């Protein structure tokens, strides 16, 4: 039997999603709790591996097991054995053809900026604080230059292991809700640090340090060192993963909880 799970987590206390020796990870906590409920070792595959400090409201995983359990065991039972910062949001038996990573057709991230002169005391690990005056309208205009298929060499980590720098961005929107500025981006897939590097460069435009046309120049230069510094991890959320409709996976509010959809 193959089971898919929807997962939400606060990544601030973990060294990323992927299981690692000697440090805590979201994957390790999920597999530990699942193995306890199943009474056998369980290994999961995920839709997207998030970095240290990055959060998820729409992460999807799958695992295989011959153990017979009601679906509530994979939600309520597993949640009872997880730390407060990790939660199973739904569980569904799926066809063996389903794969959390390879069946996905798109991923969606949201980056939340707290734009205020003073830093926040609450939610400080869930937002990125920038005190300068940000023009979200300029950021949104510049963001449209990312839409479509491009060579994102200037916007991926120098140590990115992907064989190709090309990705297809479906949409990017920059909006403001009071003191919060949100960058919402969806693509077929993402390169390492791609979202945070895009946000870092958009912030330079929103702060008035660069013109909108700078993005076009960066695409042409294909040089990561000439783009802006990588934005901080704590404002980034994996909020949704898209799959073919025939899998009929549950859909929840994108989140994070304190933001309006």
Curated annotation (Swiss-Prot):
Keywords attached to this entry: Isomerase, tRNA processing
Record-listed E.C. numbers: 5.4.99.12
Principal EC category: isomerase
Single biological process term from Gene Ontology: tRNA pseudouridine synthesis
Amino-acid positions noted as binding substrate in the UniProt annotation, renumbered to this chain: 109
Superkingdom, taxonomy of origin: Bacteria
Reaction catalysed by this enzyme: uridine(38/39/40) in tRNA = pseudouridine(38/39/40) in tRNA
Record has Disulfide bond as a keyword: no
Residues annotated as the enzyme's active site: 51 (nucleophile)
Entry function: Formation of pseudouridine at positions 38, 39 and 40 in the anticodon stem and loop of transfer RNAs.
Similarity field: Belongs to the tRNA pseudouridine synthase TruA family.
HAMAP family recorded: TruA
Subunit: Homodimer.
Protein name per the record: tRNA pseudouridine synthase A
Encoding gene per record: truA
